[in-house]
């Protein structure tokens, strides 16, 4: 998948249960619209959505399962259960929360990586990180790429945005980590997307700015 998405846009097609567009059918059509617009990949949540999206478009999919656990703040592909579901979906890449926070059931990140590779050595793994330290750890653990997904969404990075100081966080990752870096999170405009690619990001994931009409509407109203 990494070869297919080089210098390209990945559109995140997700709607949680409390959102108006929550529906596997609707997400499949959102993915089709994204493909027609030029997207080269899709990021999607849940086995059901991914299966329906793959029936609609022939784009590679980054799969996640968001699920809350009482004993952890980690909710993106947090345990073996989510890995099993994503492997059943046949997505090309699986994204896993790779922050240093404690995982549900005290599962170790290395064990989750090893488990996935043991069951399917072909599936690629994306590390959703918040800090440079986490990116370096993920690289050593055997992830295929890094995504800035959680930068600004953890207690130690709150109020940070990927675009701060002309994408200084992205620049630091690119200079310190050898595996591909995917820019994701608060990329709100075509200009931001182009800047990320210009700086050297392997690809860029955009979600809310394209696929969440309620957020787009709020931005217009201010």
UniProtKB/Swiss-Prot annotation:
Family annotation (Pfam families): NanE
Molecular-function GO terms, alphabetical: N-acylglucosamine-6-phosphate 2-epimerase activity
GO biological process: carbohydrate metabolic process; N-acetylmannosamine catabolic process; N-acetylneuraminate catabolic process
Keywords for the protein's UniProt record, in alphabetical order: Carbohydrate metabolism, Isomerase
E.C. no: 5.1.3.9
Pathway field: Amino-sugar metabolism; N-acetylneuraminate degradation; D-fructose 6-phosphate from N-acetylneuraminate: step 3/5
EC class (word): isomerase
Matching NCBIfam families: PRK01130.1 (NF002231)
Role, per record: Converts N-acetylmannosamine-6-phosphate (ManNAc-6-P) to N-acetylglucosamine-6-phosphate (GlcNAc-6-P).
Name of the protein: Putative N-acetylmannosamine-6-phosphate 2-epimerase
